[in-house]
Amino acid sequence: MKKSICLYFQVHQPTRLRTYRFFDIGKDSHYYDDFANRTILRRIAQKCYLPMNQLLLEAIKKHKGAFKVAFSISGSALEQFERYFPEVIDSFKALAATGKVEFLAETYNHSLSSLASESEFRHQVEKHKATIERLFGVTPTAFRNTELIYSDAIGEEAWNLGFKTVLTEGARHIMGWKSPNFIYSNPIQPRQKLLLRNYSLSDDIAFRFSDRGWSMWPLTADKYLSWVKESAKDDEIVNLFMDYETFGEHQKAESGIFDFMKALPGEFIADGEFEFVTPSEAARKHKAVADLEVFDPISWADEERDVTAWLGNELQQEAFNKVYAMTEKLSIVNNPELWEDYGHLQESDHFYYMCTKFFSDGEVHKYFNPYDTPYEAFINYMNVISDFQIRLDEARAALDVKETMENEIKNAPVKKAPAKKAPAKKAPVKKAPAKKK
């Protein structure tokens, strides 16, 4: 049996907030930097999404379906594609039409809801699943959480939503001596299969490809194939997971990244040792070799491979607790406009911008970050949250007034109409006696 290569890309663009000052609170409830969102989205579409989608489409056709890939595209990104650059949606539809591309489910707003609210997590995943079905005509059967965040409990929640296959990080501190180049199972739900990212080989492309100071530069397709073969010498599958913006945005076109990706499928297919598979195909093809216990959440972020990139300091924790404390009240109010804003305010990027880690991962945290400091990001976000809280409280108060009035009307005593008196009987008219003649 051939060994498997599973190539997966994350596609996400956040809904960036405008500069929102203290004096805007209670006066202006438009929170978003529409100009920045449109400008950045269109730039990345032209540099990455459109050319890379075309490259993948040509590779699928050239290799007669032997080349396969998988995507997860956040709802926040899909909304911006539809609003600012519909051609991107069309290019993903063309990939979907080949039948060789799998679209995964995730949280609609690329949120941290899996760490805070089971009901909100379920709501977002189901909303995202419905959106993928509407746009691409396929139903997601595999799941990847925001930034590959995973734990045994999160896996169980995904299982309860119908997902038997989950992607996550092959983090060193939970793997120990185990290799990420096998499929594992969730100990709570043993039939749920876990695909683990080979972070070393993935990051060779995502982060080190254009680094001229890297001892292995330049990276060519044949060299990369030899590394994958060595890594999987005694193993079954190599999972290469990375941001889609790697191609043309993080790694510029001048670096040769598109030429590399154009050559890569042919190198693997010609070698004959590997075959490309989608995540769901991998889960069907390979058996789980063992349970993988993950008590505390892991992710693919930073050296720690945990959730400290979003919740590692007091600023992040305060903002996180503040926004998720509103979930219950919002579910009572059930206002569509508030729900839409609430989704955007949950985007994990807002908390990522507040990260104070500036060591080996500092440059990663600065990329796409509109703020000069984490404190500026925190203040701006909390100003927006304060205005949102006012709107939510007002909506709840209006609902209370409405319910009170309805109850008063419902419980008001019914007044009986006074009984009508019977009309007085008239005395019979006495006829005058007839005159005697």
Each language-model region and where it sits:
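Generic structural signal for well-ordered alpha-helices
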Residues: 53-57, 89-93, 122-132, 155, ...
